């Protein structure tokens, strides 16, 4: 049956199809490599990669190869698998906690101000009530009115009033005479002194003033003109230089990015992944993040097992980005992860030393600084038996 002509034709056509698909795939991979090489998208080394949405859904990326150009803000990731997690992304959690804390603080401040306003209103109402309903105040007002209306009827009171008025008149006349004499003498002395001083000063000022004023006015005018012209010129030059530098950087970045995107769009079809708004990588012990990342999937024809991702955005330090969101954020989780990583490195180094035949150490030497051992319980017991 296999020797029949129709079966041979079918078998050959299948082989040709497989061969054609493999050729097309290798051609597409070669074109992608050529585009990356042309635009200086070089190899990058990251420990892990993950993506997240604004809602906090996390997708972990098992990457086989990463390439990028930080100047263009472009990263190409070859991923063997992408799987999602139920955990909420820590950046989203920090932002939500900050918003909730701010709302709580605003509510507390609003309640405090509300209570203070109510307290002030009550105090004002009490003050108004006391002012309007004070019986002692009314009694005092009535007594004062009665005293103003009462007329003096006794002769003894009239005589005492006349004596008091005579004494007061004599005292006032004596005081006024003395004060008028003192004032007239002071005025005359002041006038004569002022006239003599004015005459003497006018003559000296007219001679020396003309010369000094001309010199000072010329100097001050020249200095003010120089300062006023130099300061705005320097400031304008600084501003123009900064603006030009920023424009050049933006133009260069846009130029490199435009050329890369033009090339890759002409050779591949790109599929947008709108759910991936954050892209995070770990380089050694440093976490880096792209905020508002734009992630495309490079569609390969025929489809491959690997997924090629194109990530667009500027990398920045995750710690500084989190401090921008919440200045009070404490990097406890990051510090914990870094210490665990350093402990693992120390353990690996200790194991390498133990495995070498020349350096045979005692079990006490294989204990780390924090008290944990780098060996398992079985290995530890074996070393004790050998010793």
Swiss-Prot record:
Protein name from the UniProt record: Uncharacterized protein R604
Basic and acidic residues: bias regions: 204-213
Organism: Acanthamoeba polyphaga mimivirus (APMV)
Keywords, comma-separated and alphabetical: Coiled coil
Composition bias type Low complexity, residue spans: 162-175, 182-194
Coiled coil: 98-129
Region entry Disordered, spans: 1-23, 146-255
Keyword Metal-binding: no
Biased composition (Polar residues): 214-231
Coiled coil listed as a keyword: yes
